[in-house]
């Protein structure tokens, strides 16, 4: 077993005792940091940054040099899997991700390959191995993937969407095609995450960014069912240590009980769910991660500290809380405000772990 100097994050996910509440930030390696912008400029474009193991490692480590974070998260993108399936991912300036060949019907789905994680996605595994080497056991490394439903939204819509009419048309008019796509994605994501674990990821997270646009019944059928399949297929132990799994559905606060039944170790919460209520509902079945509104980081330091204190009090005493934002950090947040946030979590949480 590789020794970890700081295993707070893993311990909290497994609801084991910790000295203070661990904290990291979604998108902690990102555009709010001037050093990230410099490295991205050096890479040329976003996907070149993802595909260069040394540069992906550099941006993964940048926030850890600034802040005493309790975990590193692999620098990558959720769309690496559809890109490896041959959909032609590209980024339009100011428009976000786009695909040259969106999926329109069952025949398109049938043509999609299941990517080999050590081949088409080998650059991700190289990044994982490089980051693990450079972390030198300081903190654990989180691997991740998008959920099948969320990946499918981009693959069918051809880009990001506000109304999701194209994929919902497929869901209601041709559910068989969508289920075939989701099934293929679930298999691909399982292989992808297991490869990340074998390469050195010590925990994994599934981001279901767009699950919250579904009705309760559709969420169960088209999103949660496939995340459950992935959880069932994941390696749960590696290098002599349990590998915790976190599920995060943005806008999914009403479905926490069902999510907790998947066998995952933790649930991510966005800022619209009250953490005290979430803890009451799931009890000690899973750990909880979250859930400060990322926009709170625009506030003055005293207000940020007040919000941290409120969320810590909401969760209360005991184990099983990983502090995070309710979604990714915004690109124009002052970096020193992120520092205030991280420091406040450690300082103010000590009283809850005595």
UniProtKB/Swiss-Prot annotation:
HAMAP family: URO_D. Substrate binds at residues 27-31, 77, 154, 209, 327. This is Uroporphyrinogen decarboxylase. One of its GO terms (biological process) is protoporphyrinogen IX biosynthetic process from glutamate. GO terms for molecular function: uroporphyrinogen decarboxylase activity. PROSITE patterns: UROD_1 (PS00906), UROD_2 (PS00907). It comes from the Bacteria. GO terms for cellular component: cytosol. Keywords: Cytoplasm, Decarboxylase, Lyase, Porphyrin biosynthesis. Pathway: Porphyrin-containing compound metabolism; protoporphyrin-IX biosynthesis; coproporphyrinogen-III from 5-aminolevulinate: step 4/4. Its EC number is 4.1.1.37. Its main location: cytoplasm. Pfam families: URO-D. It is found in: Cytoplasm. It catalyses: uroporphyrinogen III + 4 H(+) = coproporphyrinogen III + 4 CO2. The gene is hemE. Homodimer.
């Amino acid at each position: 077993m590789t020794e970890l100097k700081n295993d707070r994050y893993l311990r909290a996910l497994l609801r084991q005792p910790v000295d203070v509440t661990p904290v990291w930030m979604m998108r902690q390696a990102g555009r709010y940091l001037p050093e990230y912008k410099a490295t991205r400029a050096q890479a040329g474009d976003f996907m070149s940054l993802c595909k260069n193991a040394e540069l992906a490692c550099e941006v993964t480590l940048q926030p850890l040099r600034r802040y005493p974070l309790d975990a590193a998260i692999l620098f990558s993108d959720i769309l690496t899997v559809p890109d490896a399936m041959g959909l032609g991912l590209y980024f339009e300036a100011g428009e976000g991700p786009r695909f040259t060949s969106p999926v329109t019907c069952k025949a398109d789905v049938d043509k999609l390959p299941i990517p080999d994680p050590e081949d088409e996605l080998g650059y991700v595994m190289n990044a994982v191995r490089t980051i693990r080497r450079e972390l030198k056991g300081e903190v654990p490394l989180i691997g991740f993937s998008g959920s099948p439903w969320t990946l499918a939204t981009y693959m069918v819509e051809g880009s990001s969407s506000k109304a999701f009419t194209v994929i919902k048309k497929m869901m209601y008019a041709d559910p068989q095609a969508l289920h075939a796509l989701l099934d293929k994605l679930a298999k691909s994501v399982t292989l992808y995450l297991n490869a990340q674990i074998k390469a050195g990821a010590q925990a994994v997270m599934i981001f279901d960014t767009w699950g919250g646009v579904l009705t309760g019944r559709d969420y169960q059928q088209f999103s949660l069912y496939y995340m459950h399949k992935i959880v069932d297929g994941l390696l749960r132990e590696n290098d002599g240590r349990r590998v915790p799994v976190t599920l995060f559905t943005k806008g999914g606060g009403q479905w926490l009980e069902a999510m907790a039944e998947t066998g995952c170790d933790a649930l991510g919460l966005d800022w619209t769910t009250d953490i005290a209520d979430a803890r009451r509902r799931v009890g000690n079945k899973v750990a909880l991660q979250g859930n400060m509104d990322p926009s709170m980081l625009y506030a003055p330091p005293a207000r940020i500290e007040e919000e941290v204190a409120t969320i810590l009090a909401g969760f209360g005493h005991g184990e099983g809380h990983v502090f995070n934002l309710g979604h990714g950090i915004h690109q124009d947040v002052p970096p020193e405000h992120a520092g205030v946030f991280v420091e406040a979590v450690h300082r103010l949480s000590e009283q809850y772990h005595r």
